[in-house]
Swiss-Prot record:
Similarity comment: family membership: Belongs to the polysaccharide lyase 1 family.
Protein name listed in UniProt: Probable pectate lyase B
Reactions this protein catalyses: Eliminative cleavage of (1->4)-alpha-D-galacturonan to give oligosaccharides with 4-deoxy-alpha-D-galact-4-enuronosyl groups at their non-reducing ends
GO CC annotation terms, alphabetical: extracellular region
Active site, renumbered: R219
EC number in record: 4.2.2.2
InterPro entries: Pec_lyase, Pectin_lyas_fold, Pectin_lyase_fold/virulence, PEL
Class of the enzyme per the UniProt entry, highest EC level: lyase
Sequence positions that bind Ca(2+): D133, D162, D166
Role, per record: Pectinolytic enzyme consist of four classes of enzymes: pectin lyase, polygalacturonase, pectin methylesterase and rhamnogalacturonase. Among pectinolytic enzymes, pectin lyase is the most important in depolymerization of pectin, since it cleaves internal glycosidic bonds of highly methylated pectins. Favors pectate, the anion, over pectin, the methyl ester.
GO biological process: cell wall organization; polysaccharide catabolic process
Cofactor: record remark: Binds 1 Ca(2+) ion per subunit.
Localization per record: Secreted
Amino acid sequence: MRVTAILTLATIAIASPTKVLNSRNELARRQATEGCSIGYCTQNGGTTGGAAGDTVTVTDLASLTEAAESETPLTIIVSGNIEGSAKIRVASDKTIYGETGSSITGVGFYIRQVSNVIMRNLKIGQVLADNGDAIGIDESTNVWVDHCDLSGDLSAGKDDLDGLLDITHAAEWVTVSNTYLHDHWKASLVGHSDSNADEDTGHLHITYANNYWYNINSRAPSIRFGTVHIINNYWDSLLGTGVNCRMDAQVLIQSSAFSNCPDEAIFFADSDYTGYAVVDDVDLGGSTNSVPEGTLTASSLPYDAIEALGSAQIAATIPETAGQKL
């Protein structure tokens, strides 16, 4: 489908640069109104974001904040480069979509106690801890993070920045797909505390599909209590540790690969109880898996099967497709 679109644009370009721009804008608007079709965010009625509402384009922090926090369904297209120091509270029924080449620097997005949110094709970086995570999902349902580029700053102190993508407080029906997480101390936390079992147990159903983790120190991801499916992920040049399975989490890791990583690829640490993992066609790249085998299997997942690329294809494929590539 994308190949056809690219060929069509190439043909038009010969005749009219203006038509090319218009065609690209139209393609972006179509993609911005697509609903989630992969993983856990297809459950519970699905995830459509702001598709039922109007579409607006924003070019500055004030307009982005106003649109994201509004109470009506809305598709928000981010154009250009937005910089600032802020924590935006995203309301329900929102799609926030980045145009190709757009970026957001220093601004965190807080998705708390809402539902039906899509964050797509966004490049977000250098969010200081005072502004939360680059994307924080807290006590929310039906959230899709797709084709995002999330980064930090390894030259900063470990606690100067928080997570790139944290999912906490019994959040449900979340998919993270085609996303590039890189150059950061703490990438992605599922379940924030060992003491939160009463709230988190039975929740935190999350899919990580087709993601690229590069130059990350830890939490790639770190999982407490949740039910998490990881498929077609690539970890390259991790600085510390990989997938931490903790506090009775049930994890299924399929069709994935590690490269140039330290010893602990799939492991348990820093909690009272271990988590569990079923590991199927994963190239550990010389690293290790020390987690007890779990019970989560592909046949037990409630959504349509995600095509497994095969561990041998991951290193060549995922870096080319993950990130702000729409």
